[in-house]
Amino acid sequence: MDGSTIVFILTMVCLFVYTVKHRGAKQVPSRTVQDAKPAPSVATNDPSPEPVPSAPEERVARLNRHGSDRKRAVNSDMVEIVMTMAPHVPQEKVVQDLRNTGSIEHTMENIFAGKLD
């Protein structure tokens, strides 16, 4: 082997050892957390106000009941997101549908269904 090849290989080995050594040093925690009892709270003693449904259909119905009935105010970010995904739809129609639905998801469903073309 050539002298420069040996120097290159030794340099690479040294860099590898240096990297492994410093990566291992960063993973050592500087502080240790002592085991402690959690403080009692009122929230842990109260039963949940609404039990978690077990069937997937009930979970979906619960999420739909709580999440999709609310309408959000239309802002420029919502319009920009819809326009990015569907640039062929006029912006006025997007804004109007966002005002009606209050949801990017519902507006996209309307676009896919062809209601805004």
UniProtKB/Swiss-Prot annotation:
Its main location: cytoplasm. The lineage of its organism: Eukaryota, Fungi, Dikarya, Ascomycota, Saccharomycotina. It comes from the Eukaryota. One of its GO terms (molecular function) is ubiquitin binding. It is found in: Cytoplasm; Endoplasmic reticulum. Residues 74-116 form the CUE domain. It holds the Pfam family CUE. Ubiquitinated. Present with 1850 molecules/cell in log phase SD medium. The modification Phosphoserine is found at S48. Residues 27-74 are annotated as: Disordered. It comes from Saccharomyces cerevisiae (strain ATCC 204508 / S288c). Residues 56-74 have a biased composition (Basic and acidic residues). Keywords: Cytoplasm, Endoplasmic reticulum, Isopeptide bond, Phosphoprotein, Ubl conjugation. There is a cross-link at K37 (Glycyl lysine isopeptide (Lys-Gly) (interchain with G-Cter in ubiquitin)). The CUE domain binds ubiquitin, which may facilitate intramolecular monoubiquitination. Transmembrane segments: none annotated. GO terms for cellular component: cytoplasm; endoplasmic reticulum. This is CUE domain-containing protein CUE4.
